[in-house]
């Protein structure tokens, strides 16, 4: 996990986002694929966790709550992790809104991605069979005066304790186990993640989630 801001790629300007055309009595209407899936309450965390993407996800979560506060939101995650503060903005919003947020790992959920995967509603945290998860302690690299380095070092230790507490809460592991297991990069296959408590089930087919 890093607390540095990264620029988000503008995938909409690359021409690589598929468009979906729907027919209605009023004629045709075209949506980009992500907007169409948003109508089905499906949202995505894809790529690094950074401020721009976090703001988009927070906005989508709040919008879907306003649309229907009693219907689940489905968050698909394929992320290597990234900014701690951006990830915690998403995390806090997931816990704040009324709808359950069901999480599903496709590909990988590492670092903050793994924390957000584990933060889904109890019983609704899933991963596909060949996905992988990774947990570790926050990363930090600072330069400057010794006093400033000391301030940042104490802050990153405080952040580590906060993240470990969150993981312990959602996985059911005790805090000392989490502290030891996040000391270095700790990779898990889907089945191992289920045993650890990061997810509830490994899904092999659409029907398995029902």
UniProtKB/Swiss-Prot annotation:
Described purpose of this protein according to its UniProt entry: Cleaves peptides in various proteins in a process that requires ATP hydrolysis. Has a chymotrypsin-like activity. Plays a major role in the degradation of misfolded proteins.
The reply to whether Protein transport figures as a keyword in the UniProt entry is no
* Oligomer status and interactors: Fourteen ClpP subunits assemble into 2 heptameric rings which stack back to back to give a disk-like structure with a central cavity, resembling the structure of eukaryotic proteasomes.
Q: What is this protein called in UniProt?
A: ATP-dependent Clp protease proteolytic subunit
Keyword Protease: yes or no? yes
Which GO molecular function annotation, any one, does this entry have?
Answer: ATP-dependent peptidase activity
What gene is this protein a product of? clpP
Catalytic site positions: 111, 136
Q: Which top-level group of life is the source organism from?
A: Bacteria
**Which GO BP terms sit in this record?**
protein quality control for misfolded or incompletely synthesized proteins
Q: Which InterPro entries match?
A: ClpP, ClpP/crotonase-like_dom_sf, ClpP/TepA, ClpP_His_AS, ClpP_Ser_AS
CDD domains xref list: S14_ClpP_2
Which organism does this sequence originate in? Answer: Halorhodospira halophila (strain DSM 244 / SL1)
